[in-house]
Amino acid sequence: IVAGTTVQYASSATTRATITASMKISRDEIREAVRTLHGNNAGKLTRMVNPGTGFNTSPISACFIGIISHNTLFDLKDEVGWIPVEEYANKSDVMEGEVGALDEVRFVMTTNASTFASTVTVHGTLILGSDFYGISRVSGEALRNIIKPLGSAGTSDPLDQNSTSGWKASFVAKILNENFGLRIEHAVS
């Protein structure tokens, strides 16, 4: 999914190689990404989180989804307008791993977010719109549980001391419309 062709570079960078340590993700970068997705007619992935009666809570508009690293989260928390997930008015539609929202993007943090080697470590923040990608079932065994009981290893386990249990899974995802997703490449603090 990170291989999408719609790329935005932080600050004044024009390529990944020209990103410097000071070119961190910012609210302006997020707003520029949202503007690009709107211009590409990308749909939003979430519904509005309606306001509630709780103290110090905020409604959240319908949003695109951003996938970020923990290092990117550190920088985004300093941006004006950042709403941590704890301040959402209604937490029933919070996604697993969701950490907050900024402008029209709700962010999900993962330790598997993409990084690229360059003059500095470049982080790739994905901003996804509706129908950017699709997933499909794999025919046959998409999930297979494998159990080898004690003694099944023959002469390599003559005392029947080892048994194993494991699984194999197949998963297919494909980019459907390059214009409905965007990767922001940037440095982090």
Per-region residue spans from a language model:
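Extracellular/periplasmic catalytic domains that process cell-envelope and extracellular macromolecules
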Residues: 58-60
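Short, glycine/acidic-rich hinge or "gate" loops at secondary-structure transitions
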Residues: 1-6
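Sequence/fold signature of self-assembling virion shell proteins
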Residues: 8-51, 62-67, 71-189
